[in-house]
A protein has these predicted regions:
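Accessory terminal alpha-helical modules
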Residues: 1-366
């Protein structure tokens, strides 16, 4: 460029309010960028380039609609973390005049001819572009972008690796607990305080329970089982009737599983319950949910009578009927087919002749 960055601000550079910082001995900048400029700043043309010559993964188109809809459906409370980008070109920070040359607040100028690479956030960037097509007035809202000076392909690849390898996805239970926007999740969380066996006995953060824990169930297990009960695959707001039948179902299950009553009476610990019996495991809860759905569908008038037979079920781990269904060589089995088969076993114990669509699971196993 024939002119300095400052001289060409109006026509040849982007300018942003920014904060300057130092990390690992290198300067970086956090800038506030209008959403409408994000698609212009960052473009993608790496699809045909071999992975070893790229510094980011290929964009997954399947992820974009969900993120776009999240923005559009929550215009008053969506939130995005910062994008992280490398600038291959001229970039200069000018501190605010009142702060002197060492000032941390100022303006960041980036030459328009620079190549900007997103190290973290390319799916958010694409979703923003798609959302703006439907709602362009959101273009004046801001997102923070962390800018680093590009130090070559190897460094950019390392940045991508470092930013992603230590990221830990929240557990399913924690997502349910914290998702106040999702009505189904909120209902399930409320269940944990409404149903006596669940109260103070549900692991709300993890999807597994440690051997010495006082918890007997997991939040994700109750959520999955409730979806099986209602026959829904995606979370949605439940009708008042669905909510009531769910509460009624779980209360009856508690009433007719004798070991759960021992737990309520303090005659057995949660640890011993999990150690000696199968009915606190997520797969067992799912099987119970399926049982409830079948009973309510096939016996709408007297399903409550049928469910009383749960008290006749031998839930102990030593019961050979659970082998290949909830257990494999004595260890809990994590298998969708096993859940269906366990549901069949419980249904038969409840005096139900298996419907044709249930028999097929036995045939597959046979």
């Amino acid at each position: 460029m024939s002119r300095t960055v400052e001289q060409s601000v109006s026509s040849e550079t982007y300018g942003f309010d920014a904060i300057r910082g130092t990390q690992a001995g290198n300067e970086f900048y956090v800038a506030m960028c209008p959403l409408k400029i994000i698609p212009k700043l960052f473009s993608f043309n790496d699809h045909d380039i071999p992975p070893q010559l790229r510094a980011q993964r290929v964009l997954s188109a399947a992820r974009i609609p969900a993120i776009k809809n999240y923005i559009l459906n929550n215009p008053n409370d969506y939130i995005f973390s910062s994008l992280t980008a490398s600038v291959d070109g001229v970039m200069k920070f000018t501190p605010a005049a009142s702060l002197g040359e060492e000032g941390k607040l100022g303006r960041l100028y980036i030459a328009m001819e620079s190549r900007l690479l997103i190290n973290d956030g390319q799916h958010r960037r694409k979703a923003i572009e798609e959302a703006l097509k439907e709602k362009p007035d959101m273009g004046h809202e801001m997102i923070s972008v962390v800018f680093f000076q590009d130090s070559g392909l190897k460094r950019s690849q390392q940045m991508f690796s470092d930013l992603n390898k230590n990221a830990v996805k929240p557990t399913k239970s924690l997502n349910i607990l914290y998702d106040h926007r999702d009505k189904f999740s909120k209902f399930v969380v409320d269940l944990t305080s409404e149903i006596n066996i669940f109260k103070d006995r549900v692991e709300l953060e993890k999807t597994t329970i440690s051997n010495r824990s006082k918890k007997a169930f997991t939040l994700n297990g109750i959520s999955d089982a409730t979806r099986h009960l209602l026959g829904i695959t995606k979370n949605r707001k439940l009708t008042s009737e669905e909510q009531e039948i769910t509460r009624e179902f779980w209360k009856l299950v508690v009433k007719y599983i004798s070991e759960w009553n021992l737990l309520l009476e303090g005659k057995i610990s949660s640890a011993d319950l999990r150690k000696e019996f199968v009915h606190g495991n997520t797969n067992s809860l799912n099987a119970l949910g399926i049982v409830g759905r079948v009973l309510i569908k096939e016996y709408p008038e007297d399903w409550k009578e049928k469910i009383k037979r749960l008290r006749d079920v031998d839930w102990s781990r030593t019961n050979p009927e659970w082998e290949g269904r909830l257990l494999l060589n004595g260890r809990m089995l994590k298998n969708a087919v096993g859940v269906e088969l366990a549901a069949n076993t419980i249904l038969q114990k409840c005096g139900v002749e298996l419907p044709e669509d249930r028999v097929k699971h036995e045939n597959k196993n046979g």
